[in-house]
């Protein structure tokens, strides 16, 4: 199973007590049922594929990202706190965190493997450390 420098930085940045269980579970993962599908032309066009059945999370990752970002350029541009369900590849949240008006981006996810994938793909360490990005594994609270 792969582990990147991004993952190590993100785990180190998850320093609060609220991340104790999630960090432990992420570090103990032994098998992944997903892999990345990269587009050599555009890194934003990154998909996640289920290894067992070949299903992709996105039909058109780049187009779906651009559509998802659009409301945050207009009507939600100044929202200080925004909530989402589903981490996907994480690129949407990395993009939204560029807007300093978004003081908190809270992401609920029920699949720990997808959290693992996103934390390996992108460096969220600064946002995790300062609390601008909050990742919640739903099963920790149900």
PLM segments and residue spans:
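N-terminal donor/sugar-recognition subdomains of glycan-related enzymes
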Residues: 1-142
